[in-house]
Amino acid sequence: MKKIILFFLPVMVFLSCSSSKKATIHDSGNTLTNKEKNDGWKSLFNGTSTDGWHNYGRQNVGPEWKVEDGVIHLSGSEKGKEGGDLVTNEEFENFDLKLDWKISDKGNSGIIFYVHEDPAKYHETYETGIEMQILDNGTPTRLGQPDGKLYTHRAGDLYDLMASKEVANPLGEWNHIEIKCVNGNLDFYMNGEHTLSTHLWDDNWQKMIAISKFKDMPGFGTFQKGKIALQDHGDDVWFKNIRIKRL
């Protein structure tokens, strides 16, 4: 019996440590450590309200967006009520953005950046901003969001422009992402893996746009400073631990 106990003890310790590490990544309670603060990180969500955010083209936040248990939740059941994409009050140029997201069954959403808020000229965030796709990809035995059948439209992709390495967690689990852009060098990370890299605003960027659904949107992907948006696609989606660092 003693040998059995001694054999399982290191395994139990290892599992405990692994669980704690995972919790640290995804359950920081929307708060920054002193080290993060000293390193220049800023929280974009305080866990209790949508302070610092508004719906695109308006000054308020519509009832579709709720804060529940330390999470921003777009309620699909409120579809048709006042909603719209949620955008930051501030603009960002060179930045490192991190957050956690979770999507509903067959859900669709996105994280859109470099959004130029001029609703009289650009009616939607995606007319100027660049998107990291959020999607229920489905599995070989379960149908996900139909958009996932399209190359470059799956979770973590640079939407309609570049496919990414597929590392999204199963439906119902949180995904941790990072979007980093410095002087046009764009990198995507998901769940600890580097999933995509490209350069914005050069000749190759223009070529990608020219064969995409954005080819007839003259403002798309042209602004080098802008707001961050969380997309209202009409499906339940959840966000937490939203933080950014200016670079």
Residue map of PLM features:
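Bacterial Sec-dependent N-terminal signal peptides
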Residues: 1-28
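Carbohydrate-interacting regions of secretory-pathway proteins
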Residues: 18-247
